Design a protein with these regions (language model features):
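Charged, E/D/K/R/S-rich low-complexity terminal regions of large eukaryotic assembly subunits
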Residues: 1-241
Length: 241
């Protein structure tokens, strides 16, 4: 392995270990799992917050290395995987990062998202029930952040697309898609134009959106960070109840 690449991976590995150590130090209870006993609701809550903190750290990690960071983290917490699988965000964040690293749109129909609004697979007390009830509504902030991320992702591999087609791709109403694209243009998050005089394939009048393809890694990173942050806020609010 290239020495520089090894040092880079080691850096993310140590960062991930640091977050887990913070949880172990603050809780002092995670070691009981060594004897095979499952983590209780309080431990799950604390570990969930540690996982959320790890996600925040990805903002400072270059896009090409985000997935490596997460794979290191997941390998470190492997002994607690059975307990962590009860936390919706543990399944969701790797899916978000995987989609992000491959420039794919994040689909609300993905099983990881569906589990956010489904019943807990194992009853773990009021903490997990509170998480499920809070996330069931899918907050406006999470929906908005997902929409922004998906538009930024779409701008990286579309040059021209009709508004109706983009809306279908994003799974939102055309009016919402147009409003979101316009805001991102004004904010300079994406470089695009909206042509309201373009004729669509059916002969009607529609909007044609032209992307320049100049989306930066920083903008792409920021869109992922915002989405993870909103999901973390939602989960943390539920866990604090």
């Amino acid at each position: 392995m290239n020495p520089d690449k090894f040092l880079e991976q080691q850096k993310y590995y140590e960062a991930a270990r640091g977050f887990l150590h913070k949880f172990q130090t603050n809780s002092g209870k995670i070691h009981k799992d060594d004897a095979g006993a499952p983590l209780g609701p309080d431990e799950l809550r604390d570990l969930g917050l540690a996982i959320s903190s790890c996600t925040m750290e990805t903002r400072s990690v270059h896009k090409s290395n985000v997935k490596s960071f997460w794979s290191q983290l997941v390998s470190i917490v492997e002994p607690y995987k059975t307990d962590l699988s009860m936390l919706p965000e543990f399944e969701l964040y790797p899916y978000i990062v995987d989609s992000f690293s491959k420039n794919k749109l994040i689909k609300p129909s993905n099983n990881s998202w569906q589990r956010l609004s489904g019943p807990p697979r194992v009853h773990l007390g009021e903490v997990v029930s509170a998480i499920t009830q809070t996330l069931k509504c899918e907050t406006a902030e999470v929906r908005s952040a997902m929409l922004v991320h998906n538009i930024v992702a779409a701008s990286t591999y579309y040059q021209n697309i009709y508004l109706d087609s983009l809306a279908a791709l994003l799974d939102v109403a055309p009016r919402d898609a147009e409003r979101a694209v316009a805001k991102l243009i004004i904010d300079k998050t994406i470089d695009a134009t909206i042509d309201k005089l373009a004729a669509d394939p059916t002969g009607g009048v529609s909007c044609l959106i032209a992307f320049s393809g100049a989306t930066t890694d920083d903008n792409f990173n920021d869109s992922l960070f915002r989405l993870c942050k909103e999901v973390s806020n939602c989960v943390e609010a539920a866990q604090s109840k």
